[in-house]
């Protein structure tokens, strides 16, 4: 967990039976200034943190037994201005960081042995104003960035070397102060939380080009000031953290159209100012990441 105000990262072990969290020995671990976004590679070997106050990315190796974090050689690695969210592709080969202050996206290749980051050719790549949330589709073919200040979503084709190329028609509209962005497990739909209009925009993804087309009926109502968006590993449900109303909206996803319908009992209570949100698949009582 990235602790924005204390410039460090908290790490926990998870009880397989109760789900309770216990701090890892040595936690919290030092990071840069104002750490915000955090991501772990698909194999659970490395962790990366975007430090929005020091314009860099901290990288750590994860001890498989204890969960202890150890900075990798060369960490922290330079980023753009005010890096916010970051994501790692499903192959674990590349990482992408949305730089809010410099209106671009930093792309890195990940050394499979050391975890070190190296900028891919041409990085950083231009985005809209105030890029915030970033997502990679499960096939690692496309990257999507929510541009909060320009009210649109940038879409990129990912080349084999990690280089990003804007897809035809990018950026795509239909959003208002977009923050969080998520893609479903089969790369068919994308969802964006609109902080400025209290709703969620839904798009179909062209499997060949990566272009976005608004789903019929989009945007769909949410709570007040929606931020984080997540789709469960089955692709049947979507969830939105509403910062202003202190709750979580849950939706069923129409598998054919991508349309969102609130689930029974939605919204569900949360703490004050919920922001990030994530889901996992439960296997024999344990939370597991989606299969690669």
What are these regions, as identified by a protein language model?
Residues 1-292:
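Predominantly soluble domains enriched in secretory-pathway, periplasmic, or organellar proteins
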């Amino acid at each position: 967990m990235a602790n924005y105000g204390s410039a460090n990262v908290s790490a926990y072990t998870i009880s397989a039976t109760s789900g309770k969290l216990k701090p890892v020995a040595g936690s919290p671990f030092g990071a840069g200034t104002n750490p915000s976004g955090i991501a772990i590679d698909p194999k659970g070997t490395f962790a990366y943190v975007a430090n929005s106050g020091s314009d860099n990315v901290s990288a750590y190796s994860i001890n498989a037994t204890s969960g202890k974090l150890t900075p990798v050689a060369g960490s922290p690695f330079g980023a753009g201005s005010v890096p916010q969210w970051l994501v790692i592709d499903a192959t674990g080969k590349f990482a992408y960081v949305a730089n809010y202050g410099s209106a671009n996206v930093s792309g890195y290749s990940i050394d499979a042995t050391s975890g070190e980051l190296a900028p891919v050719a041409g990085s950083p790549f231009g985005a809209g104003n105030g890029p915030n949330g970033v997502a990679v589709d499960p096939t690692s073919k496309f990257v999507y960035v929510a541009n909060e200040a320009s009210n649109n979503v940038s879409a990129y084709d990912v080349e084999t070397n990690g280089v990003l190329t804007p897809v035809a028609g990018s950026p795509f509209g239909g959003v208002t102060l977009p923050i969080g962005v998520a893609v479903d497990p089969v790369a068919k739909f994308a969802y964006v939380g609109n902080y400025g209009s209290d709703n969620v925009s839904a798009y179909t993804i062209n499997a060949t080009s990566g272009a976005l087309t608004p789903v019929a009926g989009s945007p769909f109502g949410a709570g007040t000031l929606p931020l984080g968006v997540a789709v469960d590993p089955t692709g049947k449900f979507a969830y939105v953290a509403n910062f202003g109303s202190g709750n979580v909206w849950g939706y069923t996803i129409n598998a054919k159209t991508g349309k969102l319908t609130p689930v029974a009992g939605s919204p569900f209570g949360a703490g004050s100012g919920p922001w990030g949100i994530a889901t996992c698949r439960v296997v024999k009582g344990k939370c597991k990441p989606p299969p690669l």
